Amino acid sequence: MAHLMTVQLLLLVMWMAECAQSRATRARTELLNVCMDAKHHKEKPGPEDNLHDQCSPWKTNSCCSTNTSQEAHKDISYLYRFNWNHCGTMTSECKRHFIQDTCLYECSPNLGPWIQQVDQSWRKERILDVPLCKEDCQQWWEDCQSSFTCKSNWHKGWNWSSGHNECPVGASCHPFTFYFPTSAALCEEIWSHSYKLSNYSRGSGRCIQMWFDPAQGNPNEEVARFYAEAMSGAGFHGTWPLLCSLSLVLLWVIS
C-alpha cells in the first residue's frame, strides 16, 4: 500500500512539474510577436512595406495595414472618429505624439505581455500598464503643455452626438497641465492606464519606446522578451512550494 502511494505521489509531482513547464512555454509563445484582437489590427504580424510616415518604423513586422497607418495621421479618421482639436487646434508638436501613440498601439507586435481581455463592443483585447520609457512620456507631456483639452480620460465620457468626440456638457477647456499636472498623469490616465510611466530609460531593454530608429532594429522586441520570460517564470516558480510539500510527503512515506 505504501509503495502504491509512493508511486502515485511521484507521478503527481512529475505531472505538476510538466504542466507548469508547459504553461510557461505556451505563455512565452503567446506573449511574443502577437497582435491584439481589436478593431483594426491584423490577425498576425507581418511585413508592410508602405506604412505611412510615423508608422513606418514597424514596416518590417507590423500589426497594422498600410491603410490603417495612413488613417492614423488624419484628424477625425475612420479609425475611431476622434477629434484631436476638441479644444481648439492642437499644436503640431503635441499631435505628433498622439500619432506616434496610435502607430505604436495599432502596429506594434511587441505588446503581448500587457494584452488583457475586455468585454467591449469594438474590441476584445486591450493593453494595460505598458511600461513607457520615461523620456518618451516626459517629452510627450512637455510638447503638449500649450495645447488644450477638457478631460483627463480620453477613453470615455465624450459627447459623440455629432459623429465625433466633443467635450461633454460642463467640461471646460484648459491647458493640458490643468488636467495632466505631471508626465505620469498624462501617460497613465489619458487612455485608462494603457501605459505606465517607467523608471527605466530608452535603450535599457526594460521599457517600451514609442519612438525608435528602425535602422538600429526594434528595441521593443527585447523588452517584450524580458517581460514575457519574467511572467512565464513567475508562473513556473509559483508551483514550487506545492511541489516541495508533495516531495516532503513522499519522503515521509518512503521512510
From Swiss-Prot:
InterPro entries: Folate_rcpt (IPR004269), Folate_rcpt-like (IPR018143). Residues 1-24 form the signal peptide. It holds the Pfam family Folate_rec. One of its GO terms (biological process) is regulation of canonical Wnt signaling pathway. A lipid is attached at S232 (GPI-anchor amidated serine). The keyword Secreted applies. Disruption phenotype: Embryonic lethality at about 10.5 dpc, due to gross developmental defects, including defects of neural tube closure, craniofacial defects and defects in heart development. Embryos can be rescued by maternal folate supplementation. Keywords: Cell membrane, Cytoplasmic vesicle, Disulfide bond, Endosome, Folate-binding, Glycoprotein, GPI-anchor, Lipoprotein, Membrane, Receptor, Secreted, Signal, Transport. Glycans are attached at N67, N159, N199. Folate binds at D101, Y105, W122, R123, K124, E125, R126, H155, K156, G157, W158, N159, W160, S194. Its main location: membrane. GO terms for cellular component: apical plasma membrane; basolateral plasma membrane; brush border membrane; clathrin-coated vesicle; endosome; external side of plasma membrane; extracellular region; membrane. Detected in kidney proximal tubules (at protein level). It is found in: Cell membrane; Apical cell membrane; Basolateral cell membrane; Secreted. It is a lipid-anchor; GPI-anchor; GPI-like-anchor. The secreted form is derived from the membrane-bound form either by cleavage of the GPI anchor, or/and by proteolysis catalyzed by a metalloprotease. Disulfide bonds join C35-C63, C55-C103, C64-C107, C87-C173, C94-C144, C133-C207, C137-C187, C150-C167. GO terms for molecular function: folic acid binding; folic acid receptor activity; signaling receptor activity. Residues 233-255 form a propeptide. Binds to folate and reduced folic acid derivatives and mediates delivery of 5-methyltetrahydrofolate and folate analogs into the interior of cells. Has high affinity for folate and folic acid analogs at neutral pH. Exposure to slightly acidic pH after receptor endocytosis triggers a conformation change that strongly reduces its affinity for folates and mediates their release. Required for normal embryonic development and normal cell proliferation. Required for renal folate reabsorption. Belongs to the folate receptor family. This is Folate receptor alpha. It comes from Mus musculus.
